[in-house]
Each structure stands twice: as C-alpha cells, then as structure tokens.
From Swiss-Prot:
Lineage: Eukaryota, Metazoa, Chordata, Craniata, Vertebrata
Protein name: Uncharacterized protein C1orf50
PANTHER family named among the record's database cross-references: SIMILAR TO CHROMOSOME 1 OPEN READING FRAME 50, UNCHARACTERIZED PROTEIN C1ORF50
MF (Gene Ontology): identical protein binding
Coiled-coil annotated residue ranges, if any: 71-101
Matches recorded under InterPro entries: DUF2452
Species this chain originates from: Homo sapiens
Keywords: Coiled coil
Ranges for region Disordered: 1-30
Pfam assignment, any one: DUF2452
GTP-binding in keyword set: no
Length: 199
C-alpha cells in the first residue's frame, strides 16, 4: 500500500514545484531561461530595446564626415589636375610662339644656304627688309651698315634658338644624346642577389 501511494505523493510534489507535464511519450520541453547556470548569454538591453536615438545621430555624423573627407580629397586631386592643365597650357602657348617665330625666321631673306649648327645674325635695312648674315656686329665694328636685331642658331631639327639660350639648349641636347647613346646593360644573373645582406 505504501508503494502504491508513493507515486501519487511524488506527482503531487512535482506539481507543487511547477514541473511541466510530460508531452506525450517523447518527454517534456526544456524551459527557457535568460540566465542558464546563473550566466547571462546576451544583454537584454541590446536585444530588447527598440532603438537608441544616439546611434542614429552618430551614424548621420559619420556619413557627413565621410562626405566631407571625400569632397576634400576630390578637391585636392582636382587642384593638382588644374595646375597640370595650366602648366600644359603654358607649354602649348610657348610651343606655338616658338613655331611662329621659327617660321618667320625661315622666311627671312638670306643669300646663303643655311646649315644646321651655325649661328646667323639678323639685320634690318632702312627699307624695313630683314635679312640673315654670317657676319656678327662685333666683326662689323663701328661700320655696321644696318640695325642688328638678334642672333639665332639653327638647330638640326631646323628650329631656331636665340643667342642667349644657345648654351642652355646645347647642354640639354648633349644630355639627351648621352642618354640615348648609353646601352642598357642587363645584369648577368636574373636570380635574386643577396650579396652583402648575409653575414
């Protein structure tokens, strides 16, 4: 009799303790608890809050700051491009001016065949005609018959260099000739060379 009454007493104790009833033959479902074993796995504040207005403000500030940085970077790059364009425009203007000058000098009257590498002296008659001569004002001395306008050197590309720029232009041409005449020597070994890096 006592054994038969034991299960009843046990069921009563379980019911008073709030144990869930069995779900069929498969057993009971596990109860949900926010702190299993006394430890919180997630933050209830972050999982249950509807939204923090401060986060939206911070996000908007971040987007605005990014826009400002992007605008500043684009402005800096455009400034560099504008400076390059201005420099190219100045170079283009100088090229056109030099081409116009060279064309005019090639149409100046001259009784000799002009040869590249020589310096020619430009004079102007009383009639207004301009002409080239191989005689310099120094060679004429005080008996120079006409007004001296300038001296030019005929380059091998048939361009003209003013007398005051001849030395600088010759230095540039000499440097370019030196670079073009140098042969590019390949290293004897294409494998990595660690000489001097190891003890």
């Amino acid at each position: 009799m006592e054994d038969a009454a034991a299960p009843g007493r046990t069921e009563g104790v379980l019911e008073r303790q709030g144990a869930p009833p069995a779900a069929g033959q498969g057993g009971a479902l596990v109860e949900l608890t926010p702190t299993p074993g006394g430890l919180a796995l997630v933050s209830p504040y972050h999982t249950h809050r509807a939204g923090d207005p401060l986060d939206l403000v911070a996000l908007a500030e971040q987007v605005q700051k990014a826009d400002e940085f992007i605008r500043a970077n684009a402005t800096n790059k455009l400034t560099v491009i504008a400076e390059q364009i201005q420099h190219l425009q100045e170079q283009a203007r100088k090229v056109l001016e030099d081409a116009h000058r060279d064309a005019n000098l090639h149409h100046v009257a001259c009784n000799i065949v002009k040869k590249p590498g020589n310096i020619y002296y430009l004079y102007k008659r009383e009639s207004g005609q301009q002409y080239f001569s191989i005689i310099s004002p120094k060679e004429w001395g005080t008996s120079c018959p006409h007004d001296f306008l300038g001296a030019y050197k005929l380059q091998h590309d048939l361009s003209w260099t003013p007398y005051e720029d001849i030395e600088k232009q010759d230095a540039k041409i000499s440097m370019m000739d030196t670079l073009l005449s140098q042969s590019v020597a390949l290293p004897p070994c294409t494998e990595p060379n660690f000489q001097g890096l190891t003890h």
